Amino acid sequence: MSIILDNVSYVYGQNEGYIKQALKDINLVIGKNEFIGLIGHTGSGKSTMTQILNGLLVPTTGNMYFEGLDTKEKNFNKKELRQKVGLVFQYPEHQLFETTVFKDVCFGPKNMGLSQKECELRAFEALTMVGFDSELFY
């Protein structure tokens, strides 16, 4: 897997009259099997860049390429990108959206297209692996 950012910029509020440049002319290559971390002050563009890398935002200018494909193309498969690029939100409470821990952990496998039974099996294994008592699952 490779990701290339080519002169990527992102501006918030461009159509509303409130303009805030979050990223400007970012060039980055993330090669196969590489991991990156982003650090910086509040408002420096970390969350914006992460959302672009995950396909949640599209660059205002410039291009992002995943496996050589331009992510702005109409037929680009964002699901495949999101299966390969992980995202942890800045505020953990924003990433929980189910009514139980078990259902929340099932979301990832379900989003990958696995059967309900396989999702539940994987969630059970993952929660058990990290030491959750099965009484807390439901």
Provide a role label for each language-model segment:
Residues 1-2, 11-25, 74-77, 116:
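A short, flexible loop at the N-terminus of ABC-type nucleotide-binding domains that lies
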Residues 117-136:
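Conserved ABC ATPase "signature" region
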Residues 39-41:
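The feature captures the beta-strand-to-loop junction immediately N-terminal to the Walker
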Residues 62-73, 81:
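Conserved ABC transporter NBD signature motif
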Residues 54:
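Helix-to-loop junction immediately C-terminal to a conserved catalytic motif
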Residues 93, 102-110, 120, 124:
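Short helical segment in ABC ATPase nucleotide-binding domains corresponding to the A-loop/adjacent helical element
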